[in-house]
Swiss-Prot record:
Gene3D superfamilies membership: 1.25.40.60, 3.40.50.1910, 3.40.50.2060, Syntaxin Binding Protein 1, Chain A, domain 2
Protein purpose: Involved in intracellular vesicle trafficking and vesicle fusion with membranes. Contributes to the granule exocytosis machinery through interaction with soluble N-ethylmaleimide-sensitive factor attachment protein receptor (SNARE) proteins that regulate membrane fusion. Regulates cytotoxic granule exocytosis in natural killer (NK) cells.
Species for this entry: Homo sapiens (Human)
Known disease link: Hemophagocytic lymphohistiocytosis, familial, 5, with or without microvillus inclusion disease: A rare, autosomal recessive disorder characterized by immune dysregulation with hypercytokinemia, defective function of natural killer cell, and massive infiltration of several organs by activated lymphocytes and macrophages. The clinical features of the disease include fever, hepatosplenomegaly, cytopenia, and less frequently neurological abnormalities ranging from irritability and hypotonia to seizures, cranial nerve deficits and ataxia.
GO MF annotation: an example: syntaxin-1 binding
GO terms, biological process: cellular response to type II interferon; intracellular protein transport; leukocyte mediated cytotoxicity; neutrophil degranulation; presynaptic dense core vesicle exocytosis; regulation of mast cell degranulation; vesicle docking involved in exocytosis
Complexes and interactors: Interacts with STX1A, STX2 and STX3. Interacts with STX11.
Keywords, alphabetical: Disease variant, Exocytosis, Protein transport, Transport
Effect seen on changing P477L: In FHL5; leads to a complete loss of the ability to interact with STX11
Any one GO cellular component localisation term in the record: extracellular exosome
Protein name, as recorded: Syntaxin-binding protein 2
């Protein structure tokens, strides 16, 4: 499946703006990258795309490399001390340099001292290109971005890192500005009123964007572009969503299974022996894209249905008994191994999720939903929430982190509990080793303890929804309400102030060009969006249920709006709790991601 949305835009920017810009017919080049730029490139380009553009080898600047003095090198690097020193070192050797010449592309603005150092080095004699491409984020999915900065939560919210806070906000602001510039957006910027950080970050992004606008006056131009908005909100607005056991396919799999770097590993039984398979869960897999936001109850059904349709299209008869026995189908259709393996992977993944669900997760889901909603499946208000949680806390079979998730949901429902009550709950749950993790929710802006036993909340209240849902999936992330209000122009301007005056809304009713619709081709040949975008940035990590909301709201506008969401990093419930755990520790006592 070809990259779409954000991935396509970034991939095209690298291929056209970097590699093709220095390409000469019949000439091969070497591509050198560091770890951050390698992560950006691999998130949106295949190695075959790179090699097809006259690149003979791709190398890591921090690893030992064989000199190729007959070829020119393209350097795609983040502008850091380490990478710049490694670059200079490539052109210090005698009698020959590592490469014939250098085309240097920095992912972001190169600090003046490093720039001066480059100018003083021997490298200056062989530099043919030197550009800053302003690409300081990862396109994680078509509508999801990551700043690849999981450590930023610690820098922003740990009391021991107070002196780092302003610098960290400046770095994040620059990264968000590069996202807007890459998308050709100059959005109106709004923030959730209350926390100091959201206002500070919003003002910093505006300053960085204004600098981009001064360099590129056409940034954000277009009849519909004046409606684009960037919303900045904090994790305290909805601390519930990252704690819940979600039952949609992607969120559930990443919560319950050991998926690392988006890779799912599972055992397959071949004709002779079992072997491990590793499968990347990404948008190259169209089946994953179709299934990832579906409820688990519908996933296996859907895969089986798609598999049956596929078999029938190849004139292979199937029945209920053999449709899941893929090894039998494979024997009859070995030429379709690639397609059948895809179905096999997703059946495995769904079965794996269901095994965990049928274990202890099912009963946890019911308790969590009642606590999150404040009411039961019938809509009756929860009168005794303590009665709900005690069986979970006392159950030795429930893992510590699952107990903590329930405990935090209880505390959030109550808007804090008394110190005495908290101590008892921690003791009942036997999670004394994690008591600071629970208290650290306060650092993010949540209320954990209150002398009176119940306090006020900084959370946004979810709106009541009428659409039918599964009993164990009643909760809707609050961010979805915010997105819907933003695209309908219903967001309260007092609660969500603008950092600069929004553009006049007369153009909001302007007809989109009948010739181009909401898309037009830019110079690079990729489709650029002419309609408005809503970009949502969540400080402190974004949950997978919130990622799903961006796609749902986009779909509901029938393509009139495109909603993008992102953060410093993508959260799973375990990741969220690990982030909380670090917030009262000194730097030397933790291992930052």
């Amino acid at each position: 499946m070809a990259p779409s949305g954000l991935k396509a835009v970034v991939g095209e920017k690298i291929l056209s703006g970097v590699i093709r810009s220095v390409k000469k017919d019949g000439e091969w080049k070497v591509l050198i990258m560091d770890h951050p730029s390698m992560r950006i490139l691999s998130s949106c380009c295949k190695m075959s795309d790179i090699l097809a553009e006259g690149i003979t080898i791709v190398e890591d600047i921090n690893k030992r490399r064989e000199p190729i003095p007959s070829l020119e090198a393209i350097y795609l690097l983040s502008p850091t001390e380490k990478s710049v020193q490694a670059l200079i070192k490539d052109f210090q050797g005698t009698p020959t340099f590592t490469y014939k010449a250098a085309h240097i592309f920095f992912t972001d603005t190169c600090p003046e001292p490093l720039f001066s150092e480059l100018g003083r080095s021997r490298l200056a004699k062989v530099v043919k290109t030197l550009k800053e491409i302003h690409l300081a984020f990862l396109p994680y999915e078509a509508q999801v971005f990551s700043l690849d900065a999981p450590h930023s939560t610690y820098n922003l919210y740990c009391p021991f890192r107070a002196e780092e806070r302003t610098r960290q906000l400046e770095v994040l602001a620059q990264q968000i500005a590069t996202l807007c510039a890459t998308l050709q957006e100059y959005p109106a910027i709004r923030y959730r009123k209350g926390p100091e950080d959201t206002a500070q970050l919003a003002h910093a992004v505006l300053a960085k964007l204004n600098a981009f606008k001064a360099d590129t006056p056409s940034l954000g131009e277009g009849p519909e572009k004046t409606r684009s908005q960037l919303l900045i909100m904090d994790r305290a607005a909805d601390p519930v969503s990252p704690l819940l056991h979600e039952l949609t396919f992607q969120a559930m799999a990443y919560d319950l299974l050991d998926i690392e770097q988006d890779t799912y590993r599972y055992e397959t039984t071949g004709l002779s022996e079992a072997r491990e398979k590793a499968v990347l869960l990404d948008e190259d897999d169209d089946l994953w894209v179709e299934l990832r936001h579906m409820h688990i109850a519908d996933v296996s059904k859907k895969v089986t249905e798609l598999l049956r349709t596929f078999c029938e299209s190849k004139r292979l008869t199937t029945d209920k008994a053999n449709i899941k026995d893929l090894s039998q189908i494979l024997k009859k259709m070995p030429q379709y191994q690639k397609e059948l393996n895809k179905y096999s992977t997703h059946l495995h993944l769904a079965d794996d999720c269901m095994k965990h669900f049928k274990g202890s997760v099912e009963k946890l889901c019911s308790v969590e939903q009642d606590l999150a909603m404040g009411s039961d499946a019938e809509g009756e208000k929860i009168k005794d929430s303590m009665k709900l949680i005690v069986p979970v806390l006392l159950d030795a079979a429930v893992p510590a982190y699952d107990k903590i998730r329930v405990l935090l949901l209880y505390i959030l429902l109550r808007n804090g509990v008394s110190e005495e009550n908290l101590a008892k709950l921690i003791q009942h749950a036997n999670v004394q080793a994690h008591s600071s993790l629970i208290r650290n929710l306060e650092q993010l802006g949540g209320t954990v303890t209150n002398p009176g036993g119940s306090g006020t909340s900084s959370r946004l209240e979810p709106r009541e929804r009428m659409e039918p849902t599964y009993q164990l999936s009643r909760w809707t992330p609050v961010i979805k309400d915010v997105m819907e209000d933003a695209v309908e122009d219903r967001l309260d301007r007092n609660l969500w102030p603008f950092v600069s005056d929004p553009a006049p809304t007369a153009s909001s009713q302007a007809a989109v060009s009948a010739r181009f619709g909401h898309w037009h081709k830019n110079k690079a040949g990729i489709e650029a969006r002419a309609g408005p975008r809503l970009i949502v940035y969540v400080m402190g990590g974004v949950a997978m249920s919130e990622m799903r909301a961006a796609y749902e709201v986009t779909r509901a506008t029938e393509g009139k709006w495109e909603v993008l969401i992102g953060s410093s990093h993508i959260l799973t419930p375990t990741r969220f709790l690990d982030d909380l755990k670090a917030l009262d520790k000194k730097l030397e006592d933790i291992a930052l991601p």
